[in-house]
């Protein structure tokens, strides 16, 4: 158990979390419930994916306001994982063009976990019947350009890009977890589960919210921790030594925050 501060002078405290390296999941993780095997850099195959369950194949009965919250969370996270995939694709291309094998290898590891995230978020989006963002082509082009451009500037600039992006994403996942907490509590205290044949009273039936909601929160925590590991890698890789680090980080961070706001609705 650790408390991870986001790197930088004005960034908030990340919630307590248990960390395991995103590219070395040898045990089932929350996202494993969606039948997408976790990544493993160790010898041998990963654990077989479990069958789909109520938590991964159905959605809760929510008010319009509650569904809007879930829709905004899922839409922006799916778009964010798409953007991350294209940033790392661009970074790999730019680093390879410079002959920087070390950075290529590090980027490949982070990109692998982002592909896993995107595969899971696509299933979450389908489960909760959330319309994906309409701006996919734009995000793809902009994200690839950002990744490739910073990689062509040098290793430190590429790592500064990763640091800035993952800082914003880490904070954003925390914001989403805070927003989900009242929903988990309210659905647990008001909903009578028709799937519980042993519930004779309301008190018997309201022990927990629809299983998809705590699972979603656990998946967000897992992905947040993965993104913070990418942040660690970037800082250790010399992100803060990049020329114009403060300006570069500020511009990229502002762009990420603007993209989040747009994707929540569009």
Predicted features and spans:
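Non-heme di-metal
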Residues: 2-266
């Amino acid at each position: 158990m650790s408390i991870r501060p986001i790197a930088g002078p004005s960034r908030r405290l990340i919630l307590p979390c248990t960390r395991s390296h995103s590219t070395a999941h040898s045990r089932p993780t929350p996202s494993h419930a969606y039948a997408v095997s976790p990544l493993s850099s160790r010898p041998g195959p990963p654990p077989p994916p479990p069958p789909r369950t109520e938590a991964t194949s159905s959605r809760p009965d929510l008010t319009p306001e509650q569904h809007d919250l879930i829709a905004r969370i899922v839409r922006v996270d799916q778009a964010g994982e798409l953007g991350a995939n294209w940033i790392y694709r661009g970074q790999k291309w730019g680093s390879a063009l410079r002959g920087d094998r070390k950075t290529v290898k590090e980027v490949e590891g982070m990109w692998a976990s982002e592909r896993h995230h995107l595969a899971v978020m696509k299933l979450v989006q389908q489960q909760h019947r959330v319309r994906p963002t309409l701006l996919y082509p734009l995000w793809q082009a902009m994200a690839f350009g950002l990744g490739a451009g910073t990689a062509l500037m040098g290793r430190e600039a590429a790592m500064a890009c990763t640091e800035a992006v993952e800082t914003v994403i880490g904070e954003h996942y925390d914001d989403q977890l805070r927003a989900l907490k009242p929903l988990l509590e309210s659905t647990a205290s008001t909903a009578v589960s028709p799937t519980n044949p042993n519930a004779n009273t309301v008190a018997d039936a309201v022990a927990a919210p629809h299983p998809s909601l705590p699972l979603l929160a656990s998946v967000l925590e897992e992905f947040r921790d993965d993104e913070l590991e990418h942040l660690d890698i970037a800082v250790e890789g010399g992100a803060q030594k990049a020329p114009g680090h403060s300006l570069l980080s500020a511009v990229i961070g502002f762009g990420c925050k603007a993209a989040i706001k747009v994707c929540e609705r569009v």
